């Protein structure tokens, strides 16, 4: 029988088909620890599930992982549901996860704690960014369910405490998948209106699932970026949501939020009355002090003898005028003297005088320079003539005119002794009117007169 060889692709696809048709492998529940976690830019998650003895590659596509509330991390123990298949390119089997829950802790509770830690590290809970709630808000925006008890409590409280306050309700969903986007859009709409002084965002109490919209990151960030101060009013006193931490002020209940948003009219009236009484008392005291001061002035010398006071002041004015005239004259005299001194100094140091003096000095120096140059020229001319005369006396040409000549060897070196040549050497004799080329045919050596 002839052997049939399979391709790697064919074998891999066969194994994949076997696995995918196995009902036990198409609905698998696993628990394990996450490692090598990677979050792809397209939203897919890739990681490894492991226990003490084995590991398996895991994939969770974006369509499934967008439904989980917490953030998977390396080292986290999880419970997953999925199916087993083969990744043909590597020939490895892996689990394709459809659902994932944290092992040992609630899904929502873990997501809550993770988001709380992350936003706190970013500074969204810092008191530095908290906006001040206006003390006398004219327009109060309320973002909540239009049918719940919360809106009734808020409106009743505001109308009772502050009847002149204008309430604008932004109806939203407060639970379910669409609740968070609904709340975010309401906050944006309120900010775009531009005439709202404070916002109340909240709902009545409930379970963590029912309150979850106020734990969503998008809601928290929208509250943080709101230009309008926000009071959170979610649940009851024991319920804390992420929105409570980010809001500018947290109220334990919707009723308490309304009380924090507006003042009490009765308390305001009492304050106005107290301030009116305090102002009246201050005015009476001020008038009394002014009356006492007026009485003192009326008893003063100026009020009793105004004519004498006028004459005294008139005399003082005359003396002051005389002193002013004298001071003016002294000042003018002083300035005239200063002007004369400056004029004399200017005339003495006028540039024209300096120019004349400098011009005279230059002319004197020019004449002196010409004399010295003439003297120097004559001296140099005399020295030159004497040197020329000496040079002429010592010139070899003068000696040659008396019958002498200069003898050179073949290398044009002057011969000074018969010892410098040999028989047959070619020599040149320079006379005053030309050169003789000669050959040495005999040498006769003579003694010098000095015996050398």
From Swiss-Prot:
<comment type="similarity">
    <text>Belongs to the XseA family.</text>
</comment>
<dbReference type="GO" id="GO:0005737">
    <property type="term" value="C:cytoplasm"/>
</dbReference>
<dbReference type="GO" id="GO:0008855">
    <property type="term" value="F:exodeoxyribonuclease VII activity"/>
</dbReference>
<keyword id="KW-0963">Cytoplasm</keyword>
<dbReference type="InterPro" id="IPR020579">
    <property type="entry name" value="Exonuc_VII_lsu_C"/>
</dbReference>
<dbReference type="InterPro" id="IPR025824">
    <property type="entry name" value="OB-fold_nuc-bd_dom"/>
</dbReference>
<dbReference type="GO" id="GO:0003676">
    <property type="term" value="F:nucleic acid binding"/>
</dbReference>
<comment type="subunit">
    <text>Heterooligomer composed of large and small subunits.</text>
</comment>
<dbReference type="Pfam" id="PF02601">
    <property type="entry name" value="Exonuc_VII_L"/>
</dbReference>
<dbReference type="GO" id="GO:0006308">
    <property type="term" value="P:DNA catabolic process"/>
</dbReference>
<dbReference type="Pfam" id="PF13742">
    <property type="entry name" value="tRNA_anti_2"/>
</dbReference>
<keyword id="KW-0269">Exonuclease</keyword>
<keyword id="KW-0540">Nuclease</keyword>
<dbReference type="GO" id="GO:0009318">
    <property type="term" value="C:exodeoxyribonuclease VII complex"/>
</dbReference>
<protein>
    <recommendedName>
        <fullName>Exodeoxyribonuclease 7 large subunit</fullName>
        <ecNumber>3.1.11.6</ecNumber>
    </recommendedName>
</protein>
<comment type="function">
    <text>Bidirectionally degrades single-stranded DNA into large acid-insoluble oligonucleotides, which are then degraded further into small acid-soluble oligonucleotides.</text>
</comment>
<dbReference type="InterPro" id="IPR003753">
    <property type="entry name" value="Exonuc_VII_L"/>
</dbReference>
<keyword id="KW-0378">Hydrolase</keyword>
């Amino acid at each position: 029988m002839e052997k049939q060889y399979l391709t790697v692709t064919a074998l891999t696809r066969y194994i994949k088909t076997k696995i995918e048709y196995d009902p036990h492998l198409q609905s698998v529940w696993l628990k394990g620890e996450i490692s090598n976690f990677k979050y792809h830019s397209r939203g897919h998650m890739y990681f490894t599930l492991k226990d003490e003895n084995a590991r398996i590659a895991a994939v969770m596509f974006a369509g499934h992982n967008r439904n989980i509330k917490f953030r998977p991390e390396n080292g986290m123990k999880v419970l997953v549901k999925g199916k087993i298949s083969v990744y043909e390119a590597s020939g490895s089997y892996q689990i394709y996860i459809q659902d994932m829950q944290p092992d040992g802790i609630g899904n929502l509770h873990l997501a809550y704690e993770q988001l709380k830690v992350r936003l706190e590290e970013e500074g969204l809970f810092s008191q530095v960014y908290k906006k001040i709630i206006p003390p006398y808000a004219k327009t109060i925006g309320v973002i909540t369910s239009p049918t719940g008890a919360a809106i009734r409590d808020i409106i009743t409280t505001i109308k009772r405490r502050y009847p002149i306050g204008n309430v604008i309700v932004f109806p939203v969903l407060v639970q379910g998948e669409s609740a968070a986007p609904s709340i975010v859009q309401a906050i944006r709409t309120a900010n775009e209106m531009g005439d709202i002084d404070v916002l109340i965002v909240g709902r009545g109490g409930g379970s963590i699932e029912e309150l979850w919209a106020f734990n969503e990151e998008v809601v928290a960030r929208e509250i943080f970026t709101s230009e309008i101060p926000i009071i959170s009013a979610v649940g009851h006193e024991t319920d804390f949501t992420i929105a409570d931490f980010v809001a500018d002020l947290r109220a334990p209940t919707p009723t308490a939020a309304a009380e924090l948003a507006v003042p009490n009219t009765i308390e305001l009236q009492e304050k106005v009355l107290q301030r009116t009484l305090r102002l009246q008392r201050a005015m009476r005291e001020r008038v009394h002090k002014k009356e006492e001061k007026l009485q003192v002035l009326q008893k003063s010398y100026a009020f009793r003898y105004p004519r004498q006071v006028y004459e005294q002041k008139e005399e003082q004015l005359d003396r002051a005028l005389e002193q002013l005239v004298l001071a003016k004259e002294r000042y003018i005299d002083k300035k005239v003297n200063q002007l004369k001194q400056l004029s004399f100094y200017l005339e003495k140091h006028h540039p024209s005088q300096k120019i004349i003096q400098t011009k005279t000095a230059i002319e004197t120096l020019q004449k002196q320079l010409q004399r010295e140059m003439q003297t120097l020229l004559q001296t140099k001319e005399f020295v030159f003539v004497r040197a020329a005369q000496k040079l002429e006396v010592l010139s070899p040409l003068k000696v040659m005119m008396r019958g002498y000549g200069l003898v050179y060897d073949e290398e044009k070196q002057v011969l000074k002794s018969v010892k410098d040549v040999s028989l047959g050497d070619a020599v040149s004799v320079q006379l005053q009117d030309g050169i003789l080329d000669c050959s040495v045919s005999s040498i006769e050596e003579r003694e010098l007169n000095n015996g050398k």
